[in-house]
């Protein structure tokens, strides 16, 4: 049983990012409300402490040999609450697929080193279920990689969880892919490929299974990376989706 509920966690998931990325995400006109100051400071402190390990891990990832016989990735897309988590959990039972785990989304820079210890830490403190629908949570379950991107790059839609006042900007740039610079787009693509390659190495699989609702707006960029990628688009009664969301 996890020690904390979501609302009681002393840190947020930015503990899994490097200090440099942490600063890029939190600076630039971002304001932290008074009641979240302690969580902000502790998250930044943990990020600073772990950043040297993150750099070691990233060097290891850069030196991984290419995987032979890799198959085209499969991307599960669709609006939130349309059944993407369900189909992801079902298809991930197929042994041919590798995927991004909950641990890997929080600590994408610790996928190759330090994993046993930090996985234990995460399992000890994390809540047992999602607050939105009470689905079980554990470090090894399949998870959407957008949460990993929040810790790999300052260019993620899910940063609105930390700074909801800026959701319009995040939505325009990192969900709809509008007004992106070439450097931002290149960095987003690099993170996507790095996540898939490293996850496949860790799992020993040949085909990546992705579930990421924000990818619904990223299909063009994904096809530029993976021209033969497969997509599963989840559809559900829009009234039910709206009510659930």
Region annotations inferred by a language model:
Residues 55-76, 107-109, 114-117:
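N-terminal signal-anchor transmembrane helix
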Residues 77-79, 209-213, 235:
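Short His-Asn-centered micro-motif
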Residues 106-208:
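PAPS-dependent sulfation machinery
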Residues 76-93:
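Glycine-rich phosphate-binding P-loop
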Residues 2-52:
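Charged, amphipathic alpha-helical linker segments immediately N-terminal to NTP-binding catalytic cores
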Residues 211, 222-245:
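Conserved phosphate-donor/acceptor-positioning beta-strand/loop module used by diverse small-molecule
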Residues 195-196, 211-212, 219:
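Ligand-binding pocket scaffold of soluble enzyme catalytic domains
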């Amino acid at each position: 049983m996890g020690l904390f509920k979501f609302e009681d966690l002393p840190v947020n998931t930015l503990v899994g990012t490097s200090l440099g990325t942490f600063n890029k995400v939190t600076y630039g006109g971002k304001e932290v409300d008074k009641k979240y100051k302690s969580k902000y400071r502790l998250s930044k402190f943990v990020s600073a402490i772990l950043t040297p390990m993150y750099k070691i891990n990233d060097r290891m990832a850069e030196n991984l040999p290419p995987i032979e016989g890799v198959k085209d990735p499969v991307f599960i897309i669709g609006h939130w609450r349309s059944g993407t988590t369900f189909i992801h959990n079902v298809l991930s039972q197929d042994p041919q697929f590798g995927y991004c785990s909950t641990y890997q989304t929080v600590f994408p820079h610790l996928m190759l080193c330090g994993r046993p210890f930090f996985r234990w830490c995460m399992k000890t403190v994390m809540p047992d279920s999602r607050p939105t629908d009470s689905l079980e949570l554990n470090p090894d379950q399949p998870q959407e990689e957008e949460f990993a991107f929040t810790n790999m790059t300052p260019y993620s839609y899910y940063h609105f969880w930390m700074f909801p006042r800026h959701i319009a900007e995040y939505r325009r740039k990192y969900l709809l892919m509008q007004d992106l610079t070439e450097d931002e787009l290149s960095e987003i693509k690099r993170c996507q490929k790095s996540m898939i390659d490293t996850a496949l190495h860790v799992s020993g699989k040949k085909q990546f299974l992705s579930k990421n609702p924000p990818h619904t707006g990223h299909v063009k960029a994904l096809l530029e990376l993976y021209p033969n990628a497969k997509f599963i688009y989840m559809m559900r009664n829009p009234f039910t989706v709206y009510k659930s969301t």
